[in-house]
A protein has these predicted regions:
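Charged/polar, solvent-exposed surface patches and flexible loops
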Residues: 11-14, 18, 77, 104
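Helix-turn-helix DNA-binding module
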Residues: 40
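Accessory alpha-helical/coil subdomains and C-terminal extensions
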Residues: 1-9, 13-14
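Terminal helix-turn-helix DNA-binding modules in bacterial transcription factors
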Residues: 14, 23-28, 35, 45-86
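…primarily DNA-binding HTH/wHTH and HhH modules…
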Residues: 69-70, 81-106
Length: 106
């Protein structure tokens, strides 16, 4: 998935992918990786053209989209499973990312 050889970036992405249901704070990622938040942000901007926070949100939205397409779980349950703080926040983020409401994904 990543063509970067930067081990900090690869490990950060792997940690994010493993912690979608209970996301880590960016500060926690930095502590785990032994880098500053500024260094992590530079890595993400350089190799992925986005901030760590935006990348993490994108991962969570992609997981939600998969769940909407592959399960019969309610939109609310999926929003919760992907760690969005509210259904309205999830709906806004989803619509911004995919140009459609989550309920229209099925």
């Amino acid at each position: 998935r990543l063509d970067s050889r930067n081990t900090h970036l690869i490990e950060a992405v792997q940690l994010m992918e493993r912690n979608i249901e209970e996301p880590l704070l960016i500060a926690e990622l930095c502590i785990h990786l032994g880098v500053s938040d500024r260094e992590l942000e530079r890595l993400f901007k350089r190799y992925l053209q986005q901030t760590p926070k935006a990348f993490y949100r994108q991962l969570r939205l992609e997981k939600a989209r998969w769940m909407l397409q592959q399960t019969k779980d309610s939109v609310t349950a999926i929003a919760t499973a992907c760690s969005f703080i509210s259904l309205s926040h999830f709906t806004r983020c989803y619509q911004k990312q995919f140009s459609k409401l989550p309920s229209k994904e099925r």
